[in-house]
Amino acid sequence: MSVVLDWSLIDDLRRAIARGRALPEVFGDVALGAAFELACACEAGDAALRDAVTRWSIASGVLRSSVRALAGHASPVPDPFGVPTSEIRPAPRDGRDMDDHLWTEHRERFHRSLVHLAGLPARTARAVGGAYAEMADNIISHASSDGSPTRSLVGFRVSSTEFEFAVADTGRGIRASLHERPEHRRLINHVDALDAAVRGGATRRAHAAGGGFNDLHIALADLNAVLRFRTGDAALTLDGRGADRIAARSASPMMDGFQLSVVCRC
């Protein structure tokens, strides 16, 4: 039986690679969030990790596209008015990119796919798309200390039974971002910093709540979803619907940046 590589396997897989253990030759499929995390891990990974990802990429278009997008290679521009099942691209690098027509068209395709493929009401699809855009904007706002671009990617995958979207960067991570405010320097480990940002609304900005994650929670409130947040050596998953989602914190092999993936069951 073919194995799907998703977030539940990704940390154990990275540990196995680091320890030189035997790895699967191929996966039946690679979830979007797992592909993004592997692409980011390759940035600082050793030869064994890069070789494994190269091998798996042969059979996984999602993983192959993720590695290329993180390296800054844009895929061919799709039909602006299409309804794609998936799309992966480099994340916007600055505010001008957020206003660029290619990014706007990408967001509109995601919206159409949510409505026509996943069957979401237009209002819900618009809220999900807005949260997706907010997560992409967070990369620009928080991934580096001086506002310089960092390697990052965004993407979605949609079917009639579920949809995924993910954002990832190789920047400084949540803890370093929060430490710009003195009151957050008490958050000395990554797992506490991650929890404070995602569930507590902590932010590096003095006069703002963590609106990005709040928008995400609001957009997904009525959807049955699994959210995975990962930074430094920490991961946080929220599983379920709205306020009843079950939170689980766990250790993750150390990696720079921040990675988020969302899977919603239609």
Per-range role (PLM):
Residues 1-21, 79-82, 199-266:
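Flexible, glycine-/charge-rich segments associated with ATP-binding catalytic modules
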Residues 4-78:
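Amphipathic alpha-helical interaction surfaces in cytosolic regulatory modules
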Residues 49-53, 57-119:
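Long, mid-chain structured domain cores
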Residues 91-120, 175, 182-200, 218:
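Helix-loop-beta hinge of the Bergerat
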Residues 120-158, 217-220:
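Conserved ATP-binding N-box helix of the HATPase_c
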Residues 138-180, 247:
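ATP-lid-like helix-loop hinge signature
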Residues 151-153, 179-187, 201-203, 242-249:
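Short helix/strand-bridging catalytic loops that position acidic/His residues to coordinate divalent metals
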Residues 162, 167-169, 178-181, 188, ...:
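Compact recognition or signaling/catalytic modules
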